[in-house]
Amino acid sequence: MDKEHLKKNLQEKMEKALKVLDHELKGLRTGRASVNLLDSVTVEAYGSKMPLSQVASLSTPDARTINVQVWDKSMVSSVEKGITIANLGLTPATDGQLIRLPIPALTEERRTALVKLAHKYGEDTKISLRNIRRDGNEALKKLEKDNVIAKDEHHSLSEQVQKLTDDYSSKVDSVIKQKEQEIMTV
């Protein structure tokens, strides 16, 4: 493995860790309605489990409601069941093939718990970044040991790996700060 490939590989892994964080944070409920809230909902449909988005269209008519328009009448009860099983704290209100999900306002206690969870996700991501950095530094030591790079170059590349880690760590901080503001906004 050469040094350019190593840097690119580390950057891809760090980017992936950031994407995982984004995905986890989308699942956190803020006071505002968002169809992303239903990403984790699966529905028993036609003999298998399917994502909700494959059996219904999702929309947010206002800041406190998510509408689920089920395409097949026979699927309405399965969709309701899937939403209930997902344990999102939402109560489906059915009107024909339209299921309305009113988003209850978050209590201060719940907001604080969600912020703590967001910080935990952020810390887990930073741990992943540090593990990626460690793997990168070990690979650099191996390259130096195998005489592929000189000691000076090893030091320089190791600083670049640290800078990359710091950059992604600050991105994690800003994403968490933004999510915290989103959660705490009443």
Curated annotation (Swiss-Prot):
Localization (cell): Cytoplasm
Q: Name one GO cellular component term.
A: cytosol
Instruction: Give the InterPro entries listed for this entry.
Output: Ribosome_recyc_fac, Ribosome_recyc_fac_dom, RRF_sf
Q: Which GO terms describe its biological process?
A: cytoplasmic translational termination
Regarding protein family, the annotation reads: Belongs to the RRF family.
Give start-end ranges for the coiled-coil region(s). none
Q: Which domain of life is it from?
A: Bacteria
Name of the protein in its database record: Ribosome-recycling factor
**Task of the protein:** Responsible for the release of ribosomes from messenger RNA at the termination of protein biosynthesis. May increase the efficiency of translation by recycling ribosomes from one round of translation to another.
